[in-house]
Amino acid sequence: MNTQDVIDIFKQADAILEGHFILTSGRHSAIYMQKAQVFMHADLTEKLCRGLAEKIKRSIKEKIDYVVGPAIGGLIPSYETSRHLGIPSLWVERVNGIFELRRFKIKNGARVVIVEDIVTTGLSIRETVEALVAAGADVVASACILDRSGGKVDVGVPLIALAEYEIVSYASDALPTELALLPAVKPGSRNI
């Protein structure tokens, strides 16, 4: 599966939106990849996550103990990817604004791959790495369905992206005029 295949799946699900969006990262964009529109279709989700699992297998030869997803956005892709890898899926969730591995205990040194839906700045992955290291995990890599940075983001561990697709985003104080004129919509899940 390549980048165009991923984009085609998003198009098939009518999941590429245009307007003025405030991303989960806080940055602004004229394009929003509404992964919920994809994830509501089990067949499309299965295709993406099977492709991601295959890419993870090609990239990581050593044993992986767990796949971990950051709640909320990473829950579905991490679970489905873990199913294709044949290993357990766990998640971190926010407690007082900070990710914690709340519902699970892992053995010290457990080899973990973080799976996320879409990466823009990589903040959720970096926060997930911190939570997992605090829980004793060895985070060997992270993975995502779509890297919006086009491969430029640094998440602190290797990032395996099923697709890299650079979508321009802006700081709130650097919006182009045509974007600033549109009302902003914030569809993300960071503060839920």
Curated annotation (Swiss-Prot):
Origin: domain of life: Bacteria
Gene3D superfamilies on file: 3.40.50.2020
Recorded catalytic activity of this chain's protein: orotidine 5'-phosphate + diphosphate = orotate + 5-phospho-alpha-D-ribose 1-diphosphate
Protein family membership: Belongs to the purine/pyrimidine phosphoribosyltransferase family. PyrE subfamily.
Quaternary structure and interacting proteins, as annotated: Homodimer.
Listed NCBIfam families: pyrE_Therm
PANTHER family attached to this UniProt entry: OROTATE PHOSPHORIBOSYLTRANSFERASE, URIDINE 5'-MONOPHOSPHATE SYNTHASE
Task of the protein: Catalyzes the transfer of a ribosyl phosphate group from 5-phosphoribose 1-diphosphate to orotate, leading to the formation of orotidine monophosphate (OMP).
Protein name from the UniProt record: Orotate phosphoribosyltransferase
Protein species of origin: Bartonella quintana (strain Toulouse) (Rochalimaea quintana)
